[in-house]
Structures are given as structure tokens and as C-alpha cells.
Amino acid sequence: MPTDLHPDLAALAPLLGTWTGRGSGKYPTIQPFDYLEEVTFSHVGKPFLAYAQKTRAAADGKPLHAETGYLRVPQPGRLELVLAHPSGITEIEVGSYAVTGGLIEMRMSTTSIGLTPTAKEVTALGRWFRIDGDKLSYSVQMGAVGQPLQDHLAAVLHRQR
């Protein structure tokens, strides 16, 4: 654990670093797709982790999505995720985390979604993360454009050294 990591984040120290891997997406309104992803968790000694994510198409490397924000720990076992998307969406997700041995599981769902006038309608989001050593797995559920909350993304990433 980094010596300057805020003590409230000690349980989430295994998230720190850069993770890369591959994922797949689906939704009733689009064709299924595969993507390559890079996620970085960093810190500045305050009680939050900075989060940055970007994806590109697995087939041709074209940029797909990005998001940036902060993962906060307001109290042990609780999480708050604050994110901004360049597509005109902001989200606040609230949830919990559990640490069992070397395994961390986090579950969150939206309590607030902000949309710019030109953003596509998104009504609900949820995320599940599992960190097991140097492997990070996640899934994202989304309710958008008239569709109910359902599976949208899943990926497996590996820590880069």
C-alpha cells in the first residue's frame, strides 16, 4: 500500500494502477460489439480515488467511449462514484464494497443522472466490480432510450506492471 494513501482507502488499495483488457457490449438498440479498454485508478492522498477509463473498438482501434471521475469512501464498506462522460452524461452511483481475503467486490447503482440537452436518454446505470489479485472483472447495466435496466457491458482487465 502506498504510504501516502488516505487511510479511508486502505481496503481499496489493490485498485491502484492501470488495468487493460477486453470487453463486449450489447443492447437491444445496437449491434453487439467487442472493445479494448484501459482503466486507471490513482490517488493524491485525499479520501478518494481518481478514475479514468477509455475504450476503443477491438476490430479497428477506433475510439469508442471514455469517462472520468472519482471513487469516494464516505464510510467503511460504502462507495460513491461520481462520473462524467463526454457524451453529455453525468452520474452519481452509490453502493457498497466487501473485502474477503484478497478479493474485493463492489456494487453500485445510480442515484442521480444528469443529461445535457443533446445527450441520449439514460435513466439508470449499475456497476459490479470484482478484483482478484491482478484481475479486474466488471459488468455494467443500463436503462436507456426507452429500454429497462439490463446488461450492457462486461470485461476482464489485467493489472499492468
UniProtKB/Swiss-Prot annotation:
Subunit and partners: Homodimer.
Homology family: Belongs to the nitrobindin family.
Pathway stated in the Swiss-Prot or TrEMBL entry: Nitrogen metabolism
SUPFAM superfamilies (UniProt xref): Lipocalins
Membrane-spanning residues: none
Cofactor(s) the protein needs: heme b
The protein's name in its UniProt record: Peroxynitrite isomerase 2
Organism: Mycobacterium avium (strain 104)
Domains (record comment): Forms a 10-stranded antiparallel beta-barrel structure able to accommodate a hydrophobic ligand in its interior. In fact, this fold hosts the heme group, which is located in a wide surface cleft.
Keyword Transcription regulation: no
